[in-house]
Amino acid sequence: MKKIIFYSYLKCSTCRKAVKWLDKENLEYQLIDIVEEPPLSKYLNLAFEQNSEKKRIFNTRGKAFKSIDLDINGLSREKIIQLLLSDGKLIKRPFLIFGEKIILGFNEAEYSNHLL
C-alpha cells in the first residue's frame, strides 16, 4: 500500500479535522509539521502540475499570505516554490501526499475517493 505523508499545522482546525478522519478510517500516515519542515520542492512541483491555479497552492486565508503583497500570477514556478519553502505557513494545508497524488486542504469526499 502507498504511504500517506501528511503535512499539518497544529493550530489549524482543518488539519485537525483531517487527522480525525484519517484516524477514524484507521489509515496510517506520517505526520509532519508544515511550518518546521515544509514539503520538498519535488512535492510542491507535483502540486503545481495537479492544480491549474497557482493561488490554489497558497494558504490565502492566513496571515503570512496576507502580509506579502505579491502578484503570484506574475511569478515563475521556481520563484513561487522558493517562496513557499521559505515559510511553511504560506502553503495550503493540510498538504497530503499519497503516491504521486497531492491533496490540498481537506474534503472528506476527496480523501475517501483517493485513500480508501
PLM region descriptions:
Residues 36-116:
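Thiol/selenol-based redox catalytic cores and closely related redox-interacting motifs
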Residues 1-25, 29-34:
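Local sequence-structure signature of Cys/Sec-based thiol-disulfide redox active-site neighborhoods
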